[in-house]
Amino acid sequence: MPNIDFVGKRSFFIYLSIALILFSVIVIFVKGFNLGVDFSGGSEIIVSFDKSYTIDELRNGLQTINQEYATAKIIQTNPGGGASDQFFYIITVRDSFPTLEEKQMFINSLEESFSDSSLNIEQFNDVSGYAAREIRSYAWYAVIISLIVLLAYITIRFQFSYGVGAILALAHDVIITLGFYSLFGIEMNLTAIAAFLTLAGYSLNDTIVVYDRIRENRSKNRGMDIESITNKSINEVIVRSLNTSLTTFLVVFMMFLLGGRSIASFAFGLTVGVIIGTYSSLYIASPIVIGMVKRRKKTQKA
């Protein structure tokens, strides 16, 4: 079993976490988020051509339909060639086309703008501004409700101080991960929210492993101070935690690299979240419990 002084260095890591949270908040306020169609409203059209276009050529063609489309988000999803000899692009515009007639008018305009190529509409996803606001609201409600439920669960299973430590650690993980989404311009959509909910469960599981060992060691070593018990407990579970985190990280990182655009937001959130969650379960959740236990003892003595 390793013998690392985790607790002795807790002040450094708490200040480090505060710095990371402040950095994340600043990045979010300065850059904002790259909102997907789910959250911003608009249309996402997957089109295929039998010839290749540059992004600028596509934007110029879209601009002939509507000047605002000059800033459309365009992603090429394959290099073309092979058996199908098709070139696929994802075009995202801020307009929504709620009726079939409006969709068809837009498709006709696309065909006119790119008449030198055979165009096929592979997929047409449309989200109105109202629906986007509803989705965004319900997504964040899901995150907040999950945090409340997790607080109740930890409080019932352990003590209120443990619940506070777990929720603060989870909030720490979510804020820093949000900062990375903003910093790297990763699309914020429903799969990203799924990543945050998955991260909450993963991070909580890691924290519970540590808390369970702390509770067990407190019952066995009643004469030992809380700092020593916490340090002993973390050292007993760290190998398991790091092995689990490493294998999980490798899987989600490969998903991010190779999984394609459809799961990129989800895989990115877990790639960052596994690292931050493992760190917080060792250096944030446990020190918070130490502080609250010592504070409660002082209050009881007074």
Swiss-Prot record:
Top-level taxon: Bacteria
Pfam family of the protein (one): Sec_GG
GO biological process: intracellular protein transmembrane transport; protein targeting; protein transport by the Sec complex
Signal sequence annotation: none
Main subcellular localisation: membrane
InterPro entries, A to Z: SecD/SecF_arch_bac, SecD/SecF_bac, SecD/SecF_CS, SecD_SecF_C, SecD_SecF_C_bact, SecF_bac
Keywords: Cell inner membrane, Cell membrane, Membrane, Protein transport, Translocation, Transmembrane, Transmembrane helix, Transport
Cellular component terms per the entry's GO annotation: plasma membrane
Entry membrane topology: Multi-pass membrane protein
Single GO molecular function: protein-transporting ATPase activity
Compartment(s): Cell inner membrane
Transmembrane segments: 12-32, 138-158, 166-186, 190-210, 249-269, 272-292
Family affiliation: Belongs to the SecD/SecF family. SecF subfamily.
Quaternary structure and interacting proteins, as annotated: Forms a complex with SecD. Part of the essential Sec protein translocation apparatus which comprises SecA, SecYEG and auxiliary proteins SecDF. Other proteins may also be involved.
Known function: Part of the Sec protein translocase complex. Interacts with the SecYEG preprotein conducting channel. SecDF uses the proton motive force (PMF) to complete protein translocation after the ATP-dependent function of SecA.
Protein name (database record): Protein translocase subunit SecF
Lineage: Bacteria, Thermotogati, Thermotogota, Thermotogae, Petrotogales
Name of the encoding gene: secF
